[in-house]
Amino acid sequence: MTQSNPNDQNVELNRTSLYWGLLLIFVLAVPFSNYFFN
């Protein structure tokens, strides 16, 4: 396995994990907001 650009792979990995983190925060924020506003 030849890795021509490991930096590009790290950037893609960080971007994907960032999107998953934002999605997780959004999913957790919906029931919490409903709980606080009710």
From Swiss-Prot:
Membrane topology according to the record: Single-pass membrane protein
Keywords: Chloroplast, Membrane, Photosynthesis, Photosystem II, Plastid, Reaction center, Thylakoid, Transmembrane, Transmembrane helix
Superkingdom assignment: Eukaryota
Subcellular localization(s) per the UniProt record: Plastid, Chloroplast thylakoid membrane
UniProt cross-references to InterPro entries, sorted A to Z: PSII_PsbL (IPR003372), PSII_PsbL_sf (IPR037266)
One GO term (biological process): photosynthesis
Function: One of the components of the core complex of photosystem II (PSII). PSII is a light-driven water:plastoquinone oxidoreductase that uses light energy to abstract electrons from H(2)O, generating O(2) and a proton gradient subsequently used for ATP formation. It consists of a core antenna complex that captures photons, and an electron transfer chain that converts photonic excitation into a charge separation. This subunit is found at the monomer-monomer interface and is required for correct PSII assembly and/or dimerization.
Identification of the protein by name: Photosystem II reaction center protein L
Organism encoding this protein: Cedrus deodara (Deodar cedar)
